[in-house]
């Protein structure tokens, strides 16, 4: 099983340019041919691209240095050397590229069509053809190729999830994500079972609309300061559109728990408190008393919209998904439904036209 690695430092070296050639024409009946040394080829670039099948940076643990191919040297007859082959490195979507020495953010992969030339190959050296002059008809020197660029990089992965599940340890985050997506996280009845984020895809409206959801390891008071599993995973909810605050319904003080969680998010990144959210009470199956559940909800309804569920028994999961549709994706779903309706309308019109054509042909025949 691959380990979840979301940060790693690597070194990349673009290819050196090829050397220019020192060469002279050698032809029959031409005793003193002029210079015809070709230029060296450009060194290969180091290019980074996203890969949708990657979810972790673990492949960069065993190898930390990467070098592109050098340009080939020039040859005679003014032929340039071949360009060095580019080196392509793949990273998960959501990876940010930092200069490890300056701390500057160089690139942020947010779509799968992007690519980033992080280090450019050196230019090839000029062949001796370029150095012929009135005072030097037979130059016996050429330029060496330039060195390729070098970069010391930090790759930092921030999951591109649409929804983040935040809660205390053992609130049932992994169980919930396993029930509403195809993800299969480790599930157990003890705190900190989840040691790394889990990502799943939720399919809605007959699979015409999808969104991604991530659960991160349980947050305890002081997480933003490094306590517990600390802030190492909080960055994975920085890009989310909405947050589910998930609680064990048997908690003694859900209001205080919510305040603590939101305070930790605020300490880490105040912007997170501006995201729309839902409050989810999990494990309502531990008592078979709807009135008791209603009583708990009545005490916290002033904090936000509350949905009571049992992830384990799959109780009210559709109700939760509908609430997420409304709170986080209402405009997007409306656009998708409108587009689908228009496509169906066009398809029906085409069928009518084809039917009219067939009927017309039958009448003529």
Swiss-Prot record:
GO CC annotation terms, alphabetical: cytoplasm
Record's keyword annotation contains Transferase: no
Xref: HAMAP family: GTPase_Obg (MF_01454)
Residue ranges that the Swiss-Prot or TrEMBL entry lists as coiled coil: none
Cofactors, names only: Mg(2+)
Residues in Obg domain copies: 2-160
Function (record text): An essential GTPase which binds GTP, GDP and possibly (p)ppGpp with moderate affinity, with high nucleotide exchange rates and a fairly low GTP hydrolysis rate. Plays a role in control of the cell cycle, stress response, ribosome biogenesis and in those bacteria that undergo differentiation, in morphogenesis control.
Organism the protein comes from: Leptospira borgpetersenii serovar Hardjo-bovis (strain JB197)
OBG-type G domain location: 161-329
Positions of GTP binding: 167-174, 192-196, 215-218, 282-285, 310-312
Residues that coordinate or bind Mg(2+): 174, 194
Designated name of the protein: GTPase Obg
Molecular function in Gene Ontology: GTP binding; GTPase activity; magnesium ion binding
Key words, A-Z: Cytoplasm, GTP-binding, Hydrolase, Magnesium, Metal-binding, Nucleotide-binding
